[in-house]
């Protein structure tokens, strides 16, 4: 699973005006950034080797960059958190997200230099691994 698959899934929720990957100078309000998690996570492999794995884990950071209202930002953050947390067997391009496990609760990180409130969700996206032909 690629970060772009997660970005497309988050965009399909229809909760933000824009969903992006990577740096976005002069971010408009009501956007969600999707990043690879910078936290360290232990490597796991199935007993018997990677060929026997039925699922994989993609750790992602979601940055909610909303507006100058803390109340509206928190409401949008909770909506995103719940939508992600409740996802089950969700298609994302050519992948299937089996479920999403938040690493911790919704985090308020204050405002950016423009006074726009931001919140962060760290989550593990558990996705199905199949016998797909490798390109």
Residue positions per predicted region:
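Short, solvent-exposed beta-strand/turn "edge" segments of beta-rich domains on protein surfaces
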Residues: 49-54, 112-114
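Acidic-leaning, charged glycine-interspersed low-complexity segments
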Residues: 85-129
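Intrinsically disordered, low-complexity acidic/polar segments
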Residues: 44, 71-73, 130-134
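Oligomerization/assembly interface segments of phage tail-like spikes and tubes
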Residues: 54-68, 117-128
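Mid-chain, well-packed structural core segment of small domains
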Residues: 65-89
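Small/polar-rich, solvent-exposed N-terminal microdomains that initiate assembly or binding
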Residues: 1-49, 87-91, 134-135
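Generic structural motif
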Residues: 24, 38-40, 67-69, 126-130
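A short glycine/small-residue-enriched secondary-structure motif
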Residues: 52-58, 97-100
């Amino acid at each position: 699973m690629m970060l772009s698959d997660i970005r497309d899934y988050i965009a399909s929720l229809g909760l933000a005006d824009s969903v992006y990957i990577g740096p976005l100078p002069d971010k408009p309000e009501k956007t969600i950034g999707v990043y690879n998690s910078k936290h360290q996570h232990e490597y796991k492999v199935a007993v018997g080797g990677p060929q026997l794995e039925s699922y994989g884990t993609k750790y992602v950071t979601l940055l909610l960059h909303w507006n100058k209202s803390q109340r509206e930002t928190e409401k949008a953050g909770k909506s995103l958190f719940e939508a992600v947390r409740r996802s089950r067997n969700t298609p994302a391009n050519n992948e299937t997200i089996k479920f999403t496990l938040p690493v911790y609760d919704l985090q308020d990180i204050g405002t950016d230099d423009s006074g726009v409130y931001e919140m962060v969700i760290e989550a593990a996206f558990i996705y199905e691994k199949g016998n797909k032909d490798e390109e």
